[in-house]
């Protein structure tokens, strides 16, 4: 009997096939928006992944809806986004096909701001000073999360001022023109932004809570990314870029550097940190 079972076991062992563990892919396609708060995050994370042995391709989008569509289809594999408020609608619509990987920064705030020489401090003071603002609030691109909140504020506060839709470039030009003349101006703006520092702005208090509170930035991926790229996910989860550093990188860009040069300068100044991030163990 013992010989019989030994024979059976031997045959079974011969018939077993040991399947090799599938190696993790080393090429990752990263999506990014051409926004000043997201491009530094993307650039730094790209460098860390490259230092960890990955080949990283970056695809830039001009519309957040297109970026989310590309992520759900797998045209890009990861994307940095503010899923709690700024892009919440897109996240909620697609979250069954996506996964949240890790937080990468915190503190985004979007609201209405004025130069510090303007002697009001709250949104509920705008109506009493509408004439000083020429009856308008200078907005940015329609359809953005910031403009959605700004339209909510118009209703919540019953603003007599008109919220003007336009572009970030047009808003910046109007802001610069007003500040150069020390005129009163109200704009929709965000932090981190070089503009908040350059033009010495202050956010107006929002007692009715029309605007979202400070928001986190997350790396999000298509469904299954963590399983397909377990080590890359761990590397990305180690990366955290403080808001002040994002602002500093954009300040360097405003002073004439390219984004790649500004990110490279930041990386050189944080070489030990970059090395620790890249060498994170799975």
Model segments located where?
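Extracytoplasmic "Venus flytrap"
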Residues: 27-43, 62-64
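Bacterial N-terminal signal peptides that target proteins for export
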Residues: 1-9
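Ligand-binding cleft/hinge of the Venus flytrap
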Residues: 45-53, 130-163, 268
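Pocket-flanking alpha-helical
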Residues: 42, 59-97, 173-174, 194-200
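A conserved helix-loop-strand patch within extracytoplasmic ligand-binding domains
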Residues: 96-146
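Sec/Tat signal peptide C-region and signal peptidase I cleavage site
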Residues: 18-23
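A bilobed periplasmic-binding-protein/Venus flytrap-type ligand-binding module shared by bacterial periplasmic
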Residues: 109-119, 215-228
């Amino acid at each position: 009997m013992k010989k019989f079972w030994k024979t059976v076991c031997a045959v079974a062992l011969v018939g077993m096939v040991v399947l090799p563990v599938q190696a993790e892919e080393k090429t990752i396609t990263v999506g990014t928006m051409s926004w000043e708060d997201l491009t530094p995050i993307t650039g730094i994370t790209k460098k860390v992944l490259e230092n960890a042995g990955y080949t990283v391709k970056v695809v830039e989008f001009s519309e957040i809806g297109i970026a989310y569509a590309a992520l759900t289809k797998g045209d890009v594999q990861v994307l940095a986004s503010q899923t709690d408020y700024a892009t919440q609608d897109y996240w909620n619509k697609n979250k069954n096909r996506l996964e949240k990987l890790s937080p990468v920064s915190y503190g985004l705030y979007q609201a209405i701001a004025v130069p510090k020489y303007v002697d009001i401090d709250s949104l509920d003071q705008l109506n009493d000073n509408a004439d000083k603002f020429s009856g308008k609030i200078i907005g940015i691109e329609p359809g953005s999360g910031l403009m959605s909140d700004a339209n909510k504020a118009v209703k919540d506060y019953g603003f007599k001022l008109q919220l003007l839709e336009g572009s970030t470039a047009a808003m910046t030009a109007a802001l610069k023109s007003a500040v150069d003349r020390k005129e009163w101006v109200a704009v929709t703006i965000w932090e981190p932004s070089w503009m908040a520092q350059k033009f010495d702005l202050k956010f107006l208090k929002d007692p009715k809570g029309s605007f979202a509170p400070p928001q986190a930035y997350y790396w999000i991926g298509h469904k299954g990314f963590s399983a397909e790229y377990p080590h890359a996910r761990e590397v990305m989860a180690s990366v955290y870029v403080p808001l002040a550093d994002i602002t500093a990188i954009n300040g360097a860009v405003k002073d004439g550097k390219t984004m790649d040069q500004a990110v490279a300068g930041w990386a050189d100044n944080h070489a030990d940190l970059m090395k620790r991030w890249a060498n994170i163990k799975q």
